Amino acid sequence: MKVLLHQIALALTIASAAFLFAVGGLLVFNQMRGKVGGLVTSKERMNLIEQLHKRPKDEALKQQIRQLDLQLRQHTFSQLRLSANGARAMLGALVVLLASAHFVRVMHRAAPNPVAWGARKPEENRVAFYAVAAVFGLAAAAALLLAVRPVQLPKRAPVVAEVSETPMSLDDWQQNWPAFRGQWGGGTTKTSVKLNLLWKVAVPLPGMSSPVVWGNKVFMSGADEKEERVFCFDAGNGQLLWSQPVKLSAASQLPEQLNEDTGLAAPTPVTDGRRVYAIFANGDVAAFDFTGKQVWARNLGALENAYGYSSSLALWQDRLLIQLDLGEERDAKSKVLALDTRTGRDVWQTPRPTGGSWASPVIVMVGGKPQLITCGDPWLLAYDPVSGAELWRVNGLGSDLAPSPILAGELVVALKVNSDVLAVRPTGTGDVTETHVAWKTTDGAPDVPSPVYDGKRLFLLGGGGLLQMCDPATGKEKWAQDLAEDFYSSLALAGNTLIAISRKGQIFAIEAGDAYKLIAKHLLGEACNTSPVFHGNRMYIRGKDNLFCFGE
């Protein structure tokens, strides 16, 4: 038995040494080719880019650059995979070699050996010694080479005349419901809807995110501690078209605490008509095309917040905009981040002097230019969504922010929870606290639901059910009505009708007028913490378990 074990160990030693020799040589050859792929230094690519400078509208040339770039990237990642896999294989072989060689040495005295070491010819002993030394020397050299000069991608060079997609048109954007509370975050549609239930369908996973709609598709997100998914339903009949999991190479870390009021899928997705984008409380953000194919996914790190993460995504052209307000202001963790919608790569990020918040950012148009409006503690801040540059700020908000800001005529209205309502002229630069605050009321403000503006009136709904109509020019209350329910869902406006949905699932249809007038009520039959969505003459509502469609 000892003889057999000795022979097996000896065979393993020889085989692992030969394997180390072969793989080490392959890695040395791979490294001698220089930095991987010529991704940036390719003369052919550089020449094509020079030509593109001269002919920026040459589509055939752009396509040629795109194809060459793909080939270079494939070659680059092929070399990277070879180096990484080879290094791992060498490490495994080295462990086997050392273990088996040690076993041979220990067994040597006991194992029957017709020719002892001292009985060998001196020439044979020298050959054996130098062979073993060569194997270990080559393995050490290869390991040292990889440690000192690892295979790396070249640093990212500035993109010159990058081929881009056709920009999304504002007409398409405005004809759909692509983001939280609609096109411009105001929760309004010009079309009226009827509280006539057309259908309801089960939603596969829980979530507090609201639906978004583009064309004939309704998108939502859902998650539990085991998986996170994006769903696509037929807007006409509610059929589930696809349900796709977010796939990453490594599991993402869950937040230390999960709040029941937010969970893992509280942020509402956003869509640009090509892809739908979703973010989850563990920091996973992903893009899917309209067929359900995952285009890209990445992790931003666990989004730790006292009440969970709930800021919905915003979008402008090819920028996916994410408000990350985390921890306390002193932690310096908060920022606004823009990702390339095509690739998920960072485009810009701007630090924020704020602590944790739960409000969602909104895009508004001011003087024909877009502004990204955000609420934080204590700042109401506006950014250029293209560059990330801060445009203006007002000190006037507070902690535990959940309501999102809106544009009411020419004023941005934001809420300081349970305290102030603030209206700001969004035309200044820098800190405009002393110059651009149009009015402020201090009689209390809603804690969770966001407000709505009908062109003449400003409506506020508190979490405890107090509905107020205010003068948007002064903030003065005109009338108030207690709906005697609790609310998380934001107010919405369909035509001339206010829609308010209580946490118990009671829908209130109220006339948007100079006096309170209840038009109709409808009970969903299940809890609801999401906001209503409109498309055409239909309204979509996500309940605790089902997606509902109302209309005609």
What is each stretch, according to the model?
Residues 11-27, 133-144:
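Hydrophobic membrane-insertion alpha-helices, especially the h-region
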Residues 41-80:
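Low-complexity, acidic polar-rich segments
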Residues 16-22, 83-109, 211:
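Selective detector of the "anchor" transmembrane alpha-helix that sits immediately C-terminal
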Residues 147-552:
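Noncatalytic, solvent-exposed loop/strand surfaces
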Residues 121-152:
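Internal/C-terminal transmembrane anchor helices
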Residues 1-8, 97-132:
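Cytosolic-side transmembrane helix boundary signature
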Residues 76-91, 125-129:
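Juxtamembrane/start-of-transmembrane alpha-helix segments at the extracytoplasmic/lumenal side
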Residues 30-48, 151-163:
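Alpha-helical transmembrane signal-anchor/signal-peptide segments
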